[in-house]
Structure formats: C-alpha cells, structure tokens
Amino acid sequence: MSLSQIARSISGSPTLKLNEKAALLKEKGEPVIHLGGGEPKSKIPMDAILATAAHLNTGEVRYAPADGIPALKKSIIHYTEEFYNRHVAPENVIASGGAKQAIMVALQAILNPQEEVIYPVPYWVSYPEMAKLCGAIGVPALPDDGSFYPKIQDIEQKIGSYTKVVIINSPNNPSGAMYSEEFISDIVNYCEKKDIYLIMDDIYHRLIFDGKKPINCYKYARDLSENSKIILINGVSKQYAMTGFRIGWAVANKKIIEAMTNIQSHQTSGPSILLQKAAIGALNGIQSGVESLRITLENNRNIMIDYLNSFEGVKVTKPDGTFYCFADFSVYEKNSTKLSEFLIDKVMVVTVPGSEFGMEGYLRLSFCGAIKEITEAVERMKWALDPNSPNELYIGDRKLVRDWS
C-alpha cells in the first residue's frame, strides 16, 4: 500500500495510545493508575448539560455554520472582553472542534510548504505534527539556561527567512510553566516588529496557582487593528472539564478568520450544534466550578511535588499551572520511552515520555486525578525505581516481586 509522504511522517498521539493501553489493562482487571491523561475529573457544569438537553428536546439538531452559531460567538466575544479587555466582532471569531482543530486550521490558513513554525521546548506533542501536516517545518527553541522559561533571545536565535509563525503555550503543557510577563511582552513586540504571526495557545490560562494572574497578550500589542497577526486560541475542554465536547475557538483578524472558515467548511463543517449549546451554557453559566477545579489542582500539585521530592536524584520544577508535572528521571533511565514502558509493565502506572515533548529523560505526570491515585502511583514508581526499596510490594491482595536490578 502506498501512503503519502505526509502520512508516513506523522506519528499517532502518544497520549491517545497510552489511553488505549491503559483501557485494555483495566478491562483485564489490572489495577492501572493513569498519570498520562490530559483531562480533569471534575463534573461537567450543570449549565452545559441543561443547555444541551434543552436544545436536544427541540428535535432541531441540524447543520451549524462553519464558523459557529451566533450565540456561541457572542459568548466568546464576552469571554474575550472579560479576560482580555478586548472587544472583537463576530467576524473575528471562529468556533472549532476543540482548540486543537482551531490551531490546526489557523496553521493551514497561514503556512506555505517549507515555512517554519517556532515553539519553545518543552512543547505540546501536536505542534510538530501539525507543522508537518501543512508541509511546513517545526523548529523547537530550547531555552539556553536549560529551564522551562524561555527568554526572547531563545526565540530570536531560531528566527530565519522562512519563519512564519511562533506558537506560545502558557501555562505550558507539559511543564506547567507560566511564562513571565516580560517574555510575553517581548514576544508580542518582536513578532509585530518582524511581521510574524503569533499563536497564543491559552487553553490553560485560568488554571494557574500561587495567586498568579493570567497574562493578557493584547496588553502589549501596539497594533490591535485588522492588521494584527495575533491568533488567540482557547476552549472549554480544560477549564470546564469538557474534554469530550470538543469545542474550541480562535480570535484573530477578519481575513484570517475568513480563511479558517473556508478551510473548516471543507473539513468538518461547523461543530455539532448540541456541543456549541453546551459551550454556551458553560461560558454563560455559573463559573464557580472553574475556581473549584483550580483549587483542587493546586492542592493535588502540592501533594505530587512533595511525593516526588522524596525520590533521590529526581529533579522537579514546581508547576505554575495546568495539571501536569514534568520531572527529570534521567538519573534512573535516560531513555524516557523505555522508562515509561517499564513503569506500566512493572507497576501499572501510565506516564508520558518526555521525548514526545522534546526533552529526553523526563516524564510527564498528570495530577488531575484523585489524591489516592496520585500518591499510590508515585509510591509504586519509587518502589520500582529506587534500588533501596523492599523486594515486595502489595497492590490490594496482589504481591509484586522485584525481579530486576
């Protein structure tokens, strides 16, 4: 069978593969703990459920406009005003099948083959693959100081004649790092100066800790006209725990949104009207659930960090937000894929290899589950990796024996 060059170059989502493996083990009755997932466990907002049910009861579940229904656009406009102090028109907004699709369609709208997309390391696993799908080239920018916090110089040294767009994801998946206000200001000004598109992936912007506040990219923009090349991405998946609803959006100049709408109209058409109604319910409804989730995640983060700090040799930077911890386990195994496979095979703990995010020797651990799962998972990992651990471990009535050194 002959496949296209692009198809042969694309790898599947590692998190989805891990989800499948974990599900198969659970079906067999194995006591799997999943620290690889990227979805909160809190309940979906009741306002979202009621809005969906109300529309379903009308029996009018039809095609939706390719760029989203007017009522959802109105809610997104209000959201943008509230959190970014920026008023935009409906023509500046597109609703997509999740923030992932919004980013993908934005890249398709602006990239030509062989042009370059720059993003700081560590990066979300989909950015390089999205660039490939556009026939473009992903260019990772590793901070010179080895931290998770880029400086403008780290981006500048990667800029070339083929650079078309920079993607910034803060708070960051997988590190949880919230980039400094100075860096956001610098990157906005630099991209304006160089006439480069800037995609701000703000999907986690309300899930931040320690009293920090979301950073508004528009605050530093000199050009807020229809010539602006800022593309703002967000969605309901993370902050409202609505991962299965697949509603995200982009805010950008009218020309970009028009191009994105044309592309999306030939790919998926508009998102399901039922799911758009759910998003409206979440955006317009009671917001206390977001703060409740944020507080829970901050507490879970603190517990995970305390447990990881008991690992001798493991290096961990305290996340500023999201629901991920990105820890350096290279003292035990430099090959993160090998380490991740070892942990699921030996102690049934699912993690995501750091190599998928551009940093070998690291593991991404999610702390959005129950505290009992978090603590037990880290204890299992420590037992498997620490050579000073006892020879036996009991998981329920099951006895595990170390048969490795």
How does the language model describe each region?
Residues L35, T58-R62, S75-H78, E82:
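Glycine-rich loop-to-alpha-helix module at the N-terminal edge of alpha/beta enzyme cores
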